[in-house]
Amino acid sequence: MKNNNSKKSAQIGNISSNKTTVSNSSNLARIQKIVSSHGKLSLDDQIAYMKHKGITFNHITEDAAKDYLSQNTYYYKVTAFRKNIAKINGKYTSLDFGLLSDLATIDMYLRYALIKINLDIEHTLKALLVSVITKSNAEDGYTIVKEYDMCCKNKLLEEKPKFKEKNYIPVDKKIMSRNKKIDGYHYDLYTKRKNNPPIWVLIELMSFGELIRFVEFYYDNNKYNKNLFTPAFILLKYTKNLRDSAAHSRPVLLDIVLQKQIQPTQNATEFAKNAGVEKLERHALVSNKKIHDFICMLILHDKYIKSDAMKSDRKIELTNIIERCTKRSHYYKDQADLIRVYRVLSKILANYHQKC
């Protein structure tokens, strides 16, 4: 009788286990269907899908992860950093959610620092442009606007042969018209200078992309003291994507481990060499777009910012971020690629503003 009861209990247990397996498989199939159609996942679905992909919750519990995803960030942002981790047969073998959340925090600090660095560069270059144009006896502040506009127009027509010239909007009109709304911060400047604005007004209102193009125009056209802008002419364009990612709160550490993405500039390669980055690591990681662009940003900041105090402030902030990377170093013990990036970035930062 006891043997019969034991057999029945085992059978019931097997049936229950089979039902659970079927239920889990059905739930996973449902989640995968949502993912493939780029649909919305609930918090429970997000956790289940991460577990399916091999992401563990050893450093942060599943409940804590749900709180983090609902209060601090969102799924697609924090999981973007998983792309820095290798997969085996489509699944992660050494990735914990704690590492993802830690990278997201480090990324936040880095974005804030990069914005400050870029604002320093942008302001200094605008001030330098106004200064050299003011000092030049060949410039009246208005002729250069016409020259720049003609340059932009010719370049547009060259790049887009089918573009109708009658649809072209002059540079000064384009820049000034962005500020014509009465509730805008620069409306007063617009009303006073909207017709025939001088170059110093346009420089003040230029976007970062427009500033890059104007620096290139100034250099290419052999303007007064153009050699002052040689580093900016070569490197400024490389900082734009990094600056935009930081300004719009997009992850900057995404794909930071990828190698040989670009052919790096000689300036960035030399900077890394002087920082003590070994040849193999230079070849592998200075060719990463974001590491390369970060180096370009540091070179420009060191070149154009004259205040040692400002440079020291930025270096201290970046050094604190590098030190923050080691706060949970045990999360990264199996992440050789990320450790390598950390080592390279530490050397690069140490080479910036060595007076500090």
Residue ranges and their predicted role:
Residues M1-N241, L253-C356:
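Extended intrinsically disordered or low-complexity regions, especially N/C-terminal cytosolic tails and loops
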Residues S249:
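Acidic/aromatic/glycine-rich contiguous surface patches that form carbohydrate-binding/processing clefts
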